[in-house]
Amino acid sequence: MHLATLNVRNTADRWMERRSLLARQLVDLAPDVMGVQELRMFPDQAGWIVREVERRSQGRLRYRVHRRAKTGPAGLWEGIAVLSRLPVVTTAWLDLGAQARVAQRITVRLPGGGLFDVYNAHLGLGGEVLRSGQAQRILAWMVARPPLPAVLLGDLNTRPGSPTVELLSRSLRSAHLHVHGCEPLRTAPTPLRRHATGDGSVLDYVFVNDLLDVDDAGIAFVDADPDDPGLIASDHYGLSVTVTPRPTAD
Protein backbone atom coordinates (compact mmCIF):
# COMPACT_ATOMS: atom_id res chain seq x y z
CA MET A 1 0.00 0.00 0.00
CA HIS A 2 1.58 3.25 -1.17
CA LEU A 3 0.42 6.52 0.41
CA ALA A 4 1.37 10.16 0.02
CA THR A 5 0.47 13.52 1.50
CA LEU A 6 0.96 17.10 0.33
CA ASN A 7 -0.19 20.54 1.39
CA VAL A 8 -0.92 21.99 -2.06
CA ARG A 9 -0.99 25.68 -0.97
CA ASN A 10 -4.42 26.15 -2.65
CA THR A 11 -4.08 28.31 -5.77
CA ALA A 12 -1.67 30.85 -4.25
CA ASP A 13 2.00 31.32 -5.13
CA ARG A 14 2.10 30.75 -8.89
CA TRP A 15 -0.38 27.89 -9.04
CA MET A 16 -0.87 28.12 -12.81
CA GLU A 17 2.89 27.72 -13.27
CA ARG A 18 3.56 25.07 -10.63
CA ARG A 19 0.55 22.82 -11.14
CA SER A 20 2.18 20.88 -13.98
CA LEU A 21 5.12 20.10 -11.67
CA LEU A 22 2.70 18.72 -9.11
CA ALA A 23 0.82 16.60 -11.66
CA ARG A 24 3.98 15.23 -13.25
CA GLN A 25 5.45 14.16 -9.92
CA LEU A 26 2.15 12.64 -8.84
CA VAL A 27 2.18 10.51 -12.00
CA ASP A 28 5.75 9.42 -11.24
CA LEU A 29 4.91 8.68 -7.61
CA ALA A 30 1.59 6.90 -8.37
CA PRO A 31 0.39 6.38 -4.79
CA ASP A 32 -2.65 4.25 -4.14
CA VAL A 33 -4.06 6.92 -1.84
CA MET A 34 -3.02 10.54 -1.28
CA GLY A 35 -4.12 13.16 1.22
CA VAL A 36 -4.06 16.82 0.25
CA GLN A 37 -4.49 19.89 2.41
CA GLU A 38 -5.10 23.61 1.74
CA LEU A 39 -7.22 22.62 -1.23
CA ARG A 40 -9.21 25.25 -3.11
CA MET A 41 -12.82 24.10 -3.25
CA PHE A 42 -14.00 26.49 -5.97
CA PRO A 43 -12.84 26.40 -8.64
CA ASP A 44 -12.30 22.67 -8.25
CA GLN A 45 -8.54 22.31 -7.72
CA ALA A 46 -8.65 18.58 -6.95
CA GLY A 47 -10.72 17.95 -10.06
CA TRP A 48 -8.05 19.58 -12.22
CA ILE A 49 -5.31 17.52 -10.55
CA VAL A 50 -6.96 14.14 -11.11
CA ARG A 51 -7.95 14.95 -14.69
CA GLU A 52 -4.42 16.08 -15.51
CA VAL A 53 -2.92 12.99 -13.87
CA GLU A 54 -5.22 10.75 -15.89
CA ARG A 55 -4.28 12.60 -19.08
CA ARG A 56 -0.55 12.47 -18.42
CA SER A 57 -0.67 8.79 -17.50
CA GLN A 58 -2.77 7.98 -20.59
CA GLY A 59 -5.53 6.63 -18.40
CA ARG A 60 -3.30 4.43 -16.24
CA LEU A 61 -3.90 6.48 -13.07
CA ARG A 62 -7.52 7.25 -12.27
CA TYR A 63 -8.23 8.82 -8.91
CA ARG A 64 -11.55 9.49 -7.25
CA VAL A 65 -11.67 12.63 -5.13
CA HIS A 66 -13.22 12.62 -1.66
CA ARG A 67 -13.44 16.25 -0.49
CA ARG A 68 -14.23 17.78 2.88
CA ALA A 69 -14.62 21.53 3.15
CA LYS A 70 -13.77 23.47 6.27
CA THR A 71 -16.70 24.30 8.50
CA GLY A 72 -18.63 27.57 8.17
CA PRO A 73 -17.88 30.27 5.60
CA ALA A 74 -14.24 29.16 5.35
CA GLY A 75 -15.50 26.05 3.57
CA LEU A 76 -16.41 28.10 0.52
CA TRP A 77 -12.70 28.68 0.04
CA GLU A 78 -10.71 25.79 1.39
CA GLY A 79 -10.73 22.20 2.55
CA ILE A 80 -8.93 18.88 2.40
CA ALA A 81 -9.33 15.80 0.24
CA VAL A 82 -8.24 12.23 -0.27
CA LEU A 83 -7.47 10.96 -3.76
CA SER A 84 -7.87 7.20 -4.09
CA ARG A 85 -7.23 4.63 -6.80
CA LEU A 86 -8.61 1.92 -4.53
CA PRO A 87 -12.32 1.22 -3.97
CA VAL A 88 -13.69 3.38 -1.15
CA VAL A 89 -16.14 1.61 1.13
CA THR A 90 -17.12 4.43 3.50
CA THR A 91 -16.23 8.05 4.24
CA ALA A 92 -16.65 10.18 7.35
CA TRP A 93 -15.48 13.49 8.70
CA LEU A 94 -14.81 15.12 12.06
CA ASP A 95 -15.19 18.73 13.19
CA LEU A 96 -11.95 19.61 14.98
CA GLY A 97 -13.61 22.44 16.86
CA ALA A 98 -11.34 25.41 16.17
CA GLN A 99 -10.35 27.54 13.17
CA ALA A 100 -12.94 25.72 11.02
CA ARG A 101 -10.57 22.73 10.80
CA VAL A 102 -11.75 19.24 9.90
CA ALA A 103 -10.37 15.74 9.57
CA GLN A 104 -11.66 13.05 7.26
CA ARG A 105 -11.56 9.28 7.12
CA ILE A 106 -11.90 7.08 4.09
CA THR A 107 -11.99 3.31 4.34
CA VAL A 108 -10.57 1.57 1.28
CA ARG A 109 -10.70 -2.04 0.20
CA LEU A 110 -7.29 -3.53 -0.47
CA PRO A 111 -6.63 -5.79 -3.46
CA GLY A 112 -6.58 -8.79 -1.11
CA GLY A 113 -10.00 -7.87 0.26
CA GLY A 114 -9.06 -6.35 3.60
CA LEU A 115 -10.12 -2.89 4.79
CA PHE A 116 -7.79 0.02 5.55
CA ASP A 117 -8.56 3.37 7.22
CA VAL A 118 -6.91 6.56 5.96
CA TYR A 119 -7.24 9.70 8.11
CA ASN A 120 -6.36 13.06 6.58
CA ALA A 121 -6.02 16.22 8.67
CA HIS A 122 -4.80 19.80 8.65
CA LEU A 123 -4.41 20.97 12.24
CA GLY A 124 -4.78 24.59 13.29
CA LEU A 125 -2.31 27.42 13.60
CA GLY A 126 -1.53 28.91 16.98
CA GLY A 127 -0.59 27.17 20.19
CA GLU A 128 0.03 23.57 21.09
CA VAL A 129 -2.99 23.52 23.37
CA LEU A 130 -5.23 23.99 20.33
CA ARG A 131 -3.44 21.38 18.22
CA SER A 132 -3.17 18.86 21.04
CA GLY A 133 -6.92 19.16 21.55
CA GLN A 134 -7.53 18.56 17.85
CA ALA A 135 -5.16 15.59 17.85
CA GLN A 136 -6.94 14.13 20.87
CA ARG A 137 -10.25 14.34 19.02
CA ILE A 138 -8.76 12.43 16.10
CA LEU A 139 -7.26 9.77 18.37
CA ALA A 140 -10.59 9.25 20.13
CA TRP A 141 -12.25 8.95 16.72
CA MET A 142 -9.71 6.33 15.68
CA VAL A 143 -10.10 4.33 18.90
CA ALA A 144 -13.86 4.10 18.33
CA ARG A 145 -13.29 2.22 15.06
CA PRO A 146 -12.97 -1.55 14.62
CA PRO A 147 -9.32 -2.68 14.76
CA LEU A 148 -8.21 -1.97 11.18
CA PRO A 149 -4.83 -1.01 9.73
CA ALA A 150 -4.80 2.79 9.76
CA VAL A 151 -2.70 5.82 8.88
CA LEU A 152 -3.04 9.44 9.94
CA LEU A 153 -1.43 11.81 7.48
CA GLY A 154 -1.37 15.50 6.71
CA ASP A 155 -0.07 18.92 7.65
CA LEU A 156 -0.19 18.89 11.43
CA ASN A 157 1.41 22.35 11.83
CA THR A 158 3.62 21.11 14.66
CA ARG A 159 7.27 20.21 15.04
CA PRO A 160 8.91 16.96 16.15
CA GLY A 161 9.02 16.70 19.92
CA SER A 162 6.05 19.01 20.40
CA PRO A 163 3.26 18.08 22.82
CA THR A 164 1.03 17.26 19.84
CA VAL A 165 3.56 14.88 18.29
CA GLU A 166 4.27 13.32 21.67
CA LEU A 167 0.54 12.74 22.17
CA LEU A 168 0.16 11.06 18.78
CA SER A 169 3.30 8.99 19.33
CA ARG A 170 1.84 7.29 22.39
CA SER A 171 -0.39 5.16 20.17
CA LEU A 172 0.97 5.71 16.63
CA ARG A 173 4.38 5.65 14.93
CA SER A 174 5.81 8.24 12.58
CA ALA A 175 6.63 6.32 9.40
CA HIS A 176 9.64 8.46 8.48
CA LEU A 177 11.06 8.29 12.00
CA HIS A 178 10.55 4.52 12.05
CA VAL A 179 12.44 3.96 8.79
CA HIS A 180 15.23 6.52 9.12
CA GLY A 181 15.56 7.06 12.87
CA CYS A 182 14.73 10.74 12.39
CA GLU A 183 12.24 13.04 10.71
CA PRO A 184 13.18 14.82 7.45
CA LEU A 185 15.32 17.93 7.70
CA ARG A 186 12.20 19.93 6.88
CA THR A 187 8.91 19.76 5.02
CA ALA A 188 8.33 23.53 4.88
CA PRO A 189 9.02 25.97 3.45
CA THR A 190 10.27 25.06 0.00
CA PRO A 191 11.99 27.49 -2.39
CA LEU A 192 8.51 28.56 -3.54
CA ARG A 193 8.42 30.81 -0.47
CA ARG A 194 11.28 33.02 -1.57
CA HIS A 195 11.12 35.41 1.37
CA ALA A 196 10.96 32.74 4.08
CA THR A 197 13.79 32.85 6.60
CA GLY A 198 15.33 30.24 8.87
CA ASP A 199 16.05 26.56 8.40
CA GLY A 200 12.43 25.49 8.04
CA SER A 201 10.48 22.94 10.02
CA VAL A 202 8.91 19.52 9.81
CA LEU A 203 5.15 20.10 9.81
CA ASP A 204 3.92 17.16 7.73
CA TYR A 205 3.68 13.56 8.91
CA VAL A 206 2.42 10.07 8.20
CA PHE A 207 1.60 8.15 11.39
CA VAL A 208 0.73 4.44 11.34
CA ASN A 209 -0.91 2.14 13.86
CA ASP A 210 0.44 -1.17 15.16
CA LEU A 211 -1.36 -3.21 12.51
CA LEU A 212 1.05 -1.96 9.84
CA ASP A 213 4.68 -2.55 8.93
CA VAL A 214 6.45 0.42 7.34
CA ASP A 215 8.47 -0.64 4.31
CA ASP A 216 9.71 2.74 3.08
CA ALA A 217 9.27 6.45 3.73
CA GLY A 218 10.70 9.65 2.29
CA ILE A 219 9.99 13.17 1.15
CA ALA A 220 8.25 13.76 -2.17
CA PHE A 221 7.36 16.54 -4.61
CA VAL A 222 10.89 17.90 -4.37
CA ASP A 223 11.62 18.65 -8.04
CA ALA A 224 11.93 22.27 -9.13
CA ASP A 225 11.48 23.66 -12.62
CA PRO A 226 14.86 23.23 -14.39
CA ASP A 227 14.76 26.84 -15.58
CA ASP A 228 13.44 28.35 -12.34
CA PRO A 229 14.75 26.90 -9.04
CA GLY A 230 12.12 28.86 -7.12
CA LEU A 231 9.25 27.14 -8.91
CA ILE A 232 8.28 23.93 -7.13
CA ALA A 233 5.06 21.95 -6.64
CA SER A 234 4.09 23.62 -3.34
CA ASP A 235 5.40 25.56 -0.37
CA HIS A 236 5.56 22.22 1.48
CA TYR A 237 7.37 19.07 0.50
CA GLY A 238 5.23 15.97 0.56
CA LEU A 239 5.77 12.57 2.10
CA SER A 240 5.62 9.16 0.45
CA VAL A 241 5.19 5.99 2.52
CA THR A 242 4.82 2.31 1.69
CA VAL A 243 3.20 0.05 4.28
CA THR A 244 2.10 -3.57 4.58
CA PRO A 245 -0.72 -4.77 6.83
CA ARG A 246 0.50 -7.25 9.40
CA PRO A 247 -1.01 -10.75 9.28
CA THR A 248 -3.89 -11.18 11.68
CA ALA A 249 -4.81 -14.30 13.58
CA ASP A 250 -7.84 -16.16 12.24
Could you describe each region identified by the protein language model?
Residues 15, 33, 37-119, 123, ...:
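Structured beta-strand-rich core segments of catalytic domains in phosphoester-bond hydrolases
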Residues 110, 127-129, 133:
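Soluble catalytic domains of enzymes that build or remodel membrane lipids, polysaccharides, and related
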Residues 8-11, 230:
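Phosphate-group recognition and catalysis centered on beta-loop-alpha active-site segments
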Residues 11-13, 41-44, 100, 126-129, ...:
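Active-site environment of divalent metal-dependent phosphoester hydrolases
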Residues 107, 143-150, 158-250:
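Metal-dependent phosphoester-hydrolase catalytic domains
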Residues 1-5, 12, 215, 248-250:
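Membrane-interface helix-coil boundary segments and nearby low-complexity
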Residues 19-20, 131-139:
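Charged helix-capping and loop-helix junction motifs
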Residues 2-8, 22-46, 83, 106, ...:
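Active-site beta-strand/loop signature of hydrolases that rely on acidic residues for catalysis
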